[in-house]
C-alpha cells in the first residue's frame, strides 16, 4: 500500500506541521531536509519503516513521531496514520537539544490535532510547486 503524506489543517486554515517545516528551512536546514527525506520514505513503507526513524508515542494513542538528529539538535515531527484514507497526517513538530526531555506541551498539542483530524479529516489543499516558493 502506498501512503500519501498530508498536512493537518485547523479550522482557521493554519497548518502547524507545515509552519514547523518552514521555520526549519530558516533555522535548521539540515534537520528539515532529514525530516522531509524520512517523510518521503514513509510514503513507501508506512508504519513498517522502523529503524528508529519513526516510533509510536506510547502514551498518546495513534500518535507517531519522525525522529532525526543533527548537530546536537533533535527534530521531532508528530503525525498519525489514517489507514482508511491511506494518509500520513503531519500534525506538529518541535526541535530540542540532545539530552532534553520530550516536550509534553508539544505532544499534547499534536494529540489534540490528531483527535480533531479524526473528527474533521481536514487536510491542507494541494499547493502548486510555484506557489510554495513565493
Please describe what each predicted stretch is.
Residues 1-74, 83-87, 94-134:
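Basic, Lys/Arg-enriched alpha-helical interface segments
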Amino acid at each position: 500500500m502506498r501512503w500519501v503524506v498530508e498536512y493537518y489543517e485547523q479550522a482557521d486554515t493554519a497548518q502547524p506541521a507545515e509552519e514547523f517545516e518552514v521555520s526549519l528551512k530558516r533555522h535548521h536546514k539540515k534537520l528539515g531536509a532529514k525530516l522531509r527525506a524520512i517523510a518521503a520514505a514513509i510514503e513507501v513503507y508506512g508504519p513498517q519503516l522502523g529503524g528508529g526513524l519513526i516510533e509510536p508515542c506510547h502514551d498518546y494513542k495513534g500518535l507517531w513521531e519522525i525522529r532525526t538528529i543533527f548537530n546536537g539538535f533533535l527534530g521531532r515531527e508528530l503525525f498519525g496514520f489514517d489507514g482508511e484514507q491511506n494518509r500520513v497526517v503531519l500534525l506538529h513538530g518541535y526541535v530540542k537539544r540532545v539530552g532534553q526531555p520530550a516536550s509534553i506541551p508539544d505532544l499534547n498539542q499534536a494529540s489534540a490535532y490528531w483527535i480533531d483530524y479524526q473528527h474533521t479529516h481536514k487536510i491542507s489543499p494541494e499547493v502548486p510547486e510555484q506557489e510554495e516558493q513565493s
